[in-house]
Regions:
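Short, solvent-exposed S/T- and G/P-enriched segments that are highly enriched in secreted/extracellular
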Residues: 556-570
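Hydrophobic/aromatic beta-strand segments within beta-rich folds
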Residues: 119-121, 363-365, 818, 868
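Long, ordered, helix-rich scaffold segments
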Residues: 415, 445, 551, 555, ...
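Basic, alpha-helical nucleic-acid-contacting "clamp/cap" segments
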Residues: 541
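Hydrophobic alpha-helical and helix-loop surface patches within well-folded domains
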Residues: 44, 245, 278-535, 665, ...
Length: 948
């Protein structure tokens, strides 16, 4: 395509025209730690991709930095040197074209296709402080900027900037400073001009300059980037140090990173001479051992699976205190938020699994994403969907099977994908990205979890051998290149000789998923598909069919299909008399739900319960999970409860954990059971309390209250010399932790709770780390059992410390402990408000709405607590420096912010839960508004409509 063929009016606004390709970046970065400024001297070497290009467009967000200078140079073949052909300064830079966002436009003349060009630039910008805990510096992630930035800037100005350089090492704030650059998905344009799209792969040469006084003050200061360090040398009369790093392989610019901070380090070199380094905070190097083990084993697995060795000489794992993502897969230098990488003494098996999964996920990106990269962000699922599946395949290859990672997959990935796909906000896996501002929105559960689930379905449909051969072909043909979803499916076509392209396009290009209904009659098994969203969509569906004697894979290619009993060695009478069954989605291998008829469904449940060491009907807990999830999706509460009663006692961790979620749904969904009014009937508080008590009794009856089993758990509350051997086998602790939830939170077992109370705060260090969340919840809920005011005060202080340092720091609370808030109702107002402020400052999750609402009811402080919420929201998200803006204006101006939307939805949801009394709602809003005099009178009516 020639330059003149490009139509500026038709091109997608997010993308720049592909008339040049950046071959190499040479970046020299200087960071002034005292003045919080940075300077970049850079050059980009380009080749032309079109005949006679008339312009050059490059990504840049110039509002974030000052362009000191910029030159366009052309390589003079005769002189064998570069020659400046155009020079631009800030005041003369052309304005970007209106229809291409965040870019600079340069007109060009007399450039031919084989000409080499070079862009030279110097930019200078300010570094923004984001987090006082560990003090992260990240000047290109605007998403997490808040009042914290201004507060920190003041601290920096008042306490540091004027300090003598020779005393800098005495300052703990600078010692804990971490400078990090996270580029994914398109943040690097906020630092310097570049080609900020994944389709542009380049080699990166990086140099870093730091002041000598900074380096001398902190001997353990580490400067880590994608490339291996070549040398460190003094410059500018020994006042600075220059770090020079090895060139990277070809990579997209979103993988560029560097980190500067004070770290300890552990390292090893594997059998393929790959250096593996794990960085940790000072004096915590043991916390990196788990991550090191995951990377060492993971590299072996991916080598074998892809048949391509890791293609670089090193891989670093670096924790940073503050980041929007859990981790980012930068080539050669993976960065993690602290909790996703560091495994300390007081962390649980759940946190161990989170760290293990995150390490294996990010490592898989060295192949899926970094070596083979999507052309554009609409195919981000090629990175994230595959990585989400492969983290589990990887772990399952070397971890103890007692860890039950596939159980976690069913709960956390598969079921959450179906649930996300059933929301009105769902979208295709492969989705258009029309604007750079939309890119972050597609890093969601559809790209990750649904993408993973449909690939898992293909894995089981083809079998591991064909699947592996197809993936190997895809990787080999496209290494160091960019690809699309279509290229992937064509590789599968070539290997399998099947039309995988047509089959899988339906799954990735349309939203929703099928619901299969089963009708068993004397002649055959009839299966019909309908779309969850009630549309006319149809899918080609791999059916994973099984009965007690046989399993078979059948491709359903129409709306309706009949299966003959003979094909399954099945007899109709066996189903009628309850001795056999038919399952259509065996072990939940397919991405769809199945609605069974009553007789067959009962057979599956009954035969599952009859299984033992001597009798096996080939029914797994995953099959039972599928039946429960279908009932939950349909909100068939009475049917759901009846099945749960048949399953009792529930001894499976997966099923008991899911039942815990069902219990919380029963409370939050205002569901109807056995002819009663709404479970959360707000008109009759007494009736509601009676109903909740009855629900609690139903769910408490699902566990086995075996005194010996309970005694065994009690003996593991605190670890000591007597029981430390019992603690070595932690694989049952996940089940036991959920069991304790039923016993002590749903069941209010006071005798067990009393054994949780500590004699001394030091006991907290010896608390069973796998029980710690549920034990703390039980202590919160039953603090009124303490016998004296001194004990109550003692535990109040303990809870404040726990909330501040542990409670919300783990993302596990988002998934497992939303309703833990209910257990604060006996705590003081100070403890409650501390938790509320913690959640508003660190956690974005509207699921807390129900928990807050119950807190209102139990605590009888609706107005005060709601106003505390509003005030906390106001402090964290409305103030901007010294300027205070209208709450309503802030909502209007930031309506596209996902983070803000979650906060706003939570506030609105709280009012919905308060009750049906409109006057009470108005009273709450008016009292809230009174705290914010800046809200104009004319805005109040609209504000009321927003919240009512």
């Amino acid at each position: 395509m020639s330059g003149d063929d490009f139509d500026m009016e038709e091109e997608i606004k997010a993308r720049i025209p592909k008339n040049f390709n950046p071959q190499k970046y040479n970046i020299k970065f200087y960071f002034d730690v005292l003045n919080l400024i940075y300077n970049v001297n850079g050059e980009i070497i380009l080749t032309s991709l079109t005949d006679n290009p008339q312009y050059l467009i490059i990504n840049a967000l110039t509002s974030k930095y000052e362009i000191k200078s910029m030159n366009i140079l052309k390589f003079d073949k005769i002189m064998d040197d570069w020659k400046v052909i155009q020079t631009y300064y800030l005041e003369s830079l052309p304005n970007p074209k209106d229809n291409i966002e965040e870019c600079i436009y340069f007109p060009l003349e007399n450039i031919i296709v084989d000409d080499l060009l070079k862009i030279e630039f110097e930019v200078e910008g300010e570094v923004e402080l984001l987090n006082l805990t560990g003090l992260a510096v990240n000047f290109n992630e605007p998403k997490i900027q808040s009042l914290k930035k201004n507060k920190l800037s003041n601290i920096w100005e008042n306490k540091i900037k004027d300090w003598p350089k020779e005393t800098i090492k005495e300052n703990p704030i600078i010692e804990s400073l971490v400078l990090s650059v996270v580029s994914e998905p398109n943040f690097i344009r906020l630092i310097f001009p570049c080609f900020d799209e994944p389709c542009y792969k380049s080699v990166f040469s990086f140099q870093l300059i730091l002041d000598k006084y900074y380096m001398d003050a902190f001997p353990k200061l580490k400067c880590i980037t994608n490339g291996s360090l070549i040398k460190v040398e003094p410059i500018e009369n020994n006042s600075k140090y220059l770090f020079t790093y090895k060139d990277t392989p070809l990579m997209s610019i979103y993988l560029f990173t560097f980190v500067v901070g004070n770290y300890d380090m552990i390292e090893t070199v594997n059998e393929n001479n790959i250096k593996i380094r794990v960085f940790t905070p000072l004096k915590n190097h043991h916390d990196g051992a788990l991550a090191m083990n995951m990377i060492q084993n993971g590299i072996k697995f991916y080598h074998n699976f892809f048949n391509i060795k890791y293609y670089y000489d090193k891989i670093d794992l670096v924790p940073i205190p503050d980041m929007s993502f859990r981790a980012v897969e930068n080539l050669g230098c993976i960065v993690f938020i602290n909790y996703a990488m560091l495994f300390g003494h007081f962390q649980s098996i759940l946190e161990k699994k989170l760290i293990s999964r995150t390490c294996c996920h990010e490592l898989s990106h060295m192949w899926f994403g970094n070596l083979v990269t999507m052309e554009w962000w609409n195919d981000i699922w090629l990175n994230e969907g595959f990585a989400r599946l492969f983290e589990y395949l990887c772990l399952n290859s070397f971890e103890n099977e007692k860890m039950k990672y596939w159980d976690n997959y069913i709960e956390l990935i598969y079921e959450s994908a179906l649930t996300s796909d059933e929301r009105i906000s769902t979208h295709p896996i492969n989705v258009e990205v029309p604007s750079a501002r939309n890119i972050e929105e597609i890093f969601d559960n559809i790209s990750y979890a649904k993408g993973s689930s449909v690939i898992r379905m293909l894995y089981y449909y083809l079998g591991e051998d064909l699947f592996k051969k197809s993936i190997r072909l895809y990787m080999e043909e496209n290494k160091f290149k960019n690809t699309t979803t279509e290229i992937l499916w064509k590789c599968f076509n070539n290997v399998t000789q099947l039309d995988i392209l047509t089959l899988m396009n339906e799954w990735v290009n349309i939203p929703s998923h099928p619901i299969l209904s089963i009708d068993i009659n004397k002649n055959n098994i009839n299966i019909k598909q309908t779309a969850y969203n009630k549309s006319d969509l149809l899918w080609k569906i791999p059916l994973f069919v099984k009965c007690s004697k046989k399993e078979k894979i059948i491709l359903m290619e129409s709306k309706e299909i009949n299966i003959d009993f003979k094909d399954l060695n099945l007899i109709y009478d066996d189903i009628e008399n309850g001795t056999d069954y038919i399952i259509i989605n065996s072990d939940l291998k397919g991405f769809y739900r199945v609605d069974y008829d009553g007789k067959n469904e009962n057979n599956i449940i009954d035969l599952y319960k009859k299984q033992n060491d001597k009798v096996n009907y080939n029914i797994s807990e995953y099959d039972i999970f599928g039946i429960l999830s279908m009932k939950l999706m349909k909100e068939d509460w009475s049917g759901l409860i009846e099945i749960l009663k048949k399953l009792k006692p529930i001894n499976s961790y997966l099923l008991l954990k899911y039942t815990k979620g069902i219990y919380q749904n029963v409370l939050t969904k205002k569901c109807y059971l056995e002819g009663y009014e709404s479970v959360l009937d707000e008109i009759n508080q007494k009736k509601e309390e009676e109903k909740v008590k009855e629900i609690n009794n139903i769910f408490l009856g699902l566990i086995d209250n075996d005194p010996d089993f309970i005694k065994k758990i009690e003996n593991k509350f605190y670890i000591n010399e007597e029981n430390k051997d019992m603690y070595k086998d932690q694989y049952n602790d996940e089940y036991e932790s959920v069991f304790l939830y039923f016993l002590c939170i749903i069941g209010d077992n006071v005798d067990v709770v009393k054994k949780m109370f500590m004699n001394d705060l030091k006991d907290f260090e010896f608390m069973n780390k796998n029980y710690k969340y549920i034990m703390i919840e039980a202590i919160m809920k039953n603090i009124n059992l303490l016998e004296s005011d001194v004990q109550v005060q003692y535990y109040e202080e303990f809870l404040k410390d726990y909330i501040s340092n542990y409670y919300v720091n783990s993302t596990l609370i988002k998934r497992d402990n939303q309703n833990a808030l209910l257990n604060f109702d006996n705590c003081s107002k100070e403890v409650i408000e501390l938790l509320i402020n913690k959640i508003f400052s660190e956690v974005n999750d509207i699921r807390y709405g129900f928990s807050f609402s119950q807190l209102f009811k139990r605590n009888k402080s609706k107005l005060n607590i709601f106003c505390s919420l509003m005030e906390g929201f106001h402090k964290n998200y409305i103030n901007s420096g010294d300027k205070t803006i209208s709450f309503l204006t802030y909502l209007k101006n930031n309506r596209n912010s996902i983070e803000l939307a979650n906060k706003f939805m939570l506030l609105r949801k709280l009012l919905l839960y308060v009750g049906n009394d409109k006057n009470l709602k108005i009273q709450i809003i008016e009292k809230s508004i009174s705290k914010f005099p800046e809200i104009k009178q004319e805005d109040k009516e609209e504000l009321f409509s927003l919240f009512l």
